[in-house]
Each structure stands twice: as C-alpha cells, then as structure tokens.
Amino acid sequence: MEVQLQELVDKIKKDGVAAADEKAAEIIRAAEEKAKNIIEKAEAEAQESVKKAEAEALRFQKAAESSIDQAGRNTLISFRQGLLNELNAIIKAETAKNYDSAVLKNLIPEAVKGWVKTGNTENLSVILADKDLKELESSLSAALKDHIAKGMELKADSKIAGGFRIGTKDGSAYYDFSAEAVADLFSSYLSPKTAEILKNAAKEL
C-alpha cells in the first residue's frame, strides 16, 4: 500500500512538473514571439524614420540648391538691368549734350526741306525743347521765313529734353529726332548686345 501511495505521489509530481515545464515553455515561446514582433516593428519603424529623414534631407538640399540658383539668377538679372539703366542714362545724357544749338540750327532747316519735298508746308510743325526754341527762334525764323509765311509753325514742348520733332500739326504723322527718341534707338541696339555679352560671361562663371 505504501509503495502504491509513493508511486501515486511520484506520478503527481512528475505530471505536475511536466505540465509546469510545458506551460513555462509556452510562456517563453509567446514572450519570444512577442519580442520578435516588437523588434521587427521597431526595426520597420526605424527604417521608415530613416527613409523619411533622408527624403527630408534631400528635399532641403534641393530647396537650398534651388534657392542658391535663383539667388544667382536674380543677382545677374539685377546687375544686368542696373548696367543697362546706367548705359541708357549715359546715352541719353550724351545724345542731349550733342544736340547743341549749332547742330540744331543746321539740322532743322535740312529736315524741313526734306519734309517739304514730300508734303506741304501749311500743316507743318517743328517742336523743340523750351530752352532751344528761346535760343534758336530768331535764327530759325530767318532761315525758315518762307515756310513760316506759308503756315509752318515753330513751338516748344516741355517734354522734349533736346533735339526736335517735325510733323503735321495734328500729330498724325511725324519724325522724332528728339534726344530721347534717338537715345532709345541706340539703347534698343545696345540692350541685346549687352545682354548677350553678360549671358556669355555668365556661362564662364
């Protein structure tokens, strides 16, 4: 009887230990699986974070490069425009300076003669700057007295800095020899040339 009881006790212990071992193994397996999932998830999140960080860094780099390129273009455009403005100002100043009274005194009568060959004198008007008309009115009136007698008029325009305009009294047809118009003509040629020079220079930077 004692032997059977001992065997029963031993069996219970054995079964209990086996069950405990199996349970422990199950717990360990579950823990390992959970740990594996956590690690995989953490690694995936880490990789995603790295990708996002790299993409953001690349975006910032491209944005910075684009900003630098744009700043360079803006600087070149600003420099070119500033240079053209300076050159235009010089051209206009020099053109106005060279339209002195001696030049106008000879040029205006020749322009009137040329106009009269293609049209009448009655409707003709010669417009000068205020200062030039005051200085030249006497000599021009003498040189053009026949045309003035037929209706041609000499008058001043405060908008003209130098030179003159010749045309019909109503302004429907005219030739503009004002300092500004002549300067603009030179500038229209100069601007593309200057732009081309600056463009070629920029390629070498």
UniProtKB/Swiss-Prot annotation:
UniProt entry keywords in alphabetical sequence: ATP synthesis, Hydrogen ion transport, Ion transport, Transport
SUPFAM superfamilies the UniProt entry points to: V-type ATPase subunit E-like
Segments traversing the membrane: none
Top-level taxon in the UniProt lineage: Bacteria
One family name in Pfam for this protein: vATP-synt_E
Positions of disulphide bridges: none
GO biological process terms held by the UniProt record: proton motive force-driven plasma membrane ATP synthesis
GO cellular component: proton-transporting two-sector ATPase complex, catalytic domain
One of the record's GO molecular function terms: proton-transporting ATPase activity, rotational mechanism
Family annotation (HAMAP family): ATP_synth_E_arch (MF_00311)
NCBIfam families, per database record: PRK01558.1
Family label: Belongs to the V-ATPase E subunit family.
Function: Produces ATP from ADP in the presence of a proton gradient across the membrane.
Name listed for the protein in its UniProt record: V-type ATP synthase subunit E
Species: Treponema denticola (strain ATCC 35405 / DSM 14222 / CIP 103919 / JCM 8153 / KCTC 15104)
